[in-house]
Amino acid sequence: MLRVIGAGLPRTGTMTLKSALETLLGAPCHHMSEVFQRVETDPPAFLAAARGERTDWDAILAGYAAAVDWPASAFHAELAERYPDAIVVMSRRDSFDTWWKSCNDTIFTGMDTGEYATSAWRAMIDAVWEKSFGNAPRSDRDAVEAAYHRYHERVRETVPAERLVEFTTGAGWGPLCDALGLPVPDEPFPYLNTTREWHERTGEVPPGGVPGPGGS
């Protein structure tokens, strides 16, 4: 049963958030890095959900106490309806410019090329992009920026304020612990998956440049 639903876009500290939530909740948190271990099941399941097919979220997310990052964050509204007692955490960068640079330095690299271009994986990536950014082309900075701001406003409009936590990694444990009613752990807040660290993992990224394990 999910206790935390992530609504933040990729490259907004989602790997950091995953680690923090796993510490707080004592259970796994779904993230794009998990999908790489579930390539036979997750891409088809999330693609079917994006197409409007009936989705068994309990089965897809069995064993997880939280779900952040794509693909799950693209379905934050559906998940919030399915799990009404869960809080929704929208992780953010400090500006569109820093987010755009981080994405272009990492997960956008080669996203539209490679042998994954026609696979279920590629179809899943395209589907979650469309759910998040509509018809904005990934190469059109202005269109993506407009869609980026619309996305955040849509989350604020659809998630009740009492359930929504807007989170930046610099905030540390406080906002998460307050929202979950949990004590602050006696350990430093994790800070993971910088652009440099992402590039150290590029050997793990499949052809096509889709987000790899740790793709925050």
Specify the residue positions occupied by each region the protein language model found.
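Short, well-ordered alpha-helix to beta-strand connector turns
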Residues: G63-Y64, A86
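PAPS-dependent sulfotransferase catalytic core
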Residues: M1-A62
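Short, well-ordered alpha-helical microsegments
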Residues: T14-M15, S73-A77, F96, G172-L176
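Ligand-binding grooves and catalytic loops that recognize ribose/phosphate and carbohydrate rings
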Residues: T41-D56, N104-S119, F133-P137, W198-S216
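PAPS-dependent sulfotransferase catalytic domain
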Residues: L25-C29, E34-Q37, A48-L61, A74, H76-E166, A179-L182
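The conserved 3'-phosphoadenosine-5'-phosphosulfate
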Residues: E34-P43, V89-F96, G114-Y116, R150-G212
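A structural signal for short, well-ordered beta-strand segments and their strand-loop junctions
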Residues: G6-G8, P28-M32, V68-D69, I87-R92, ...
